[in-house]
Amino acid sequence: MRINHPLTGSIVALITPMFDDGSIDFGVLKSLVAFHIDSGTKAIVSMGTTGESATLNQDEHIEVIRATIEFANSRIPIIASTGANSTSEAIELTKAAKVIGADACLLVTPYYNRPTQEGLYQHYKLIAETVDIDQILYNVPSRTAVDLCVETVLRLSNIDNIIGIKDATGDLNVAKALIEQCADDFLFYSGDDATAVEFILMGGHGGISVTANITPKQVASAYQFALENDRELAESTNAPLADLHQHLFIESNPIPIKWAMFKMGKCNNGIRLPLMILSQQAQAMLEQDLSNLGII
């Protein structure tokens, strides 16, 4: 079956808030979920790249997803990030996400071991066949060192519970090819804040956004205008965020977004090694962006 809940528009790639010692701050997590519900965010991705999935162990990974689902209390869909570079581990994470009530799962391509296209196809196929939950592919070759080719996505799109893809290549030609060639009920999400509005105007269904952690109302409005094919309003709403979109990636995500949210008073300044607190030079740039937007 195709998806039966409304995963379109602005989907936040939520941070995992931490105390200064790196332990998880579940109190702040609860407040962030409420913040997004109140701000018009359409869904939350829990434990993705922005959520520091790489530095949390598997028990913590599941506990953060479980808490996010509990705090949401069915008021907003929760997409659990359950990808891994081991197919068996991805299956176990996806099974756990289904049991605790996730609405869908986001599965990054296996990283580091660099599978072939056939290996990628078999990886996703087995997960989909093993766990009956809606699944979204996630292609981010800049991080994984492997690119999920359009032809492989087309093959995977024929599997019933693979419902869409997050394309974080930032290449609108790739987006165009995907949108033109896949079935109408296959969902396309931008994973690149800088090009997300244009991606949606081309026929995408939404964006999984880092910037939405800071400006959820503006991102939600820009994406909604784009979904309505109102280019002028979509672009004018998004334009003030252009510098922020860029500077949130001046160092590796989620370093800049976590510092920006700390500066806003939304969370503590905790982050886990090997990631470190944002450098002073980058802090000055982001602080100027936040000031220009009237956030601080």
Swiss-Prot record:
Q: What is this protein called?
A: 4-hydroxy-tetrahydrodipicolinate synthase
Q: How does it assemble?
A: Homotetramer; dimer of dimers.
Reactions mediated catalytically:
L-aspartate 4-semialdehyde + pyruvate = (2S,4S)-4-hydroxy-2,3,4,5-tetrahydrodipicolinate + H2O + H(+)
What organism does the record attribute this protein to? Ruthia magnifica subsp. Calyptogena magnifica
Read off the CDD domains from this record. Answer: DHDPS (cd00950)
Q: Which Pfam families match?
A: DHDPS (PF00701)
Q: Where in the cell is it found?
A: Cytoplasm
Q: Its annotated pathway? A: Amino-acid biosynthesis; L-lysine biosynthesis via DAP pathway; (S)-tetrahydrodipicolinate from L-aspartate: step 3/4
Annotated positions for site Part of a proton relay during catalysis: T49, Y112
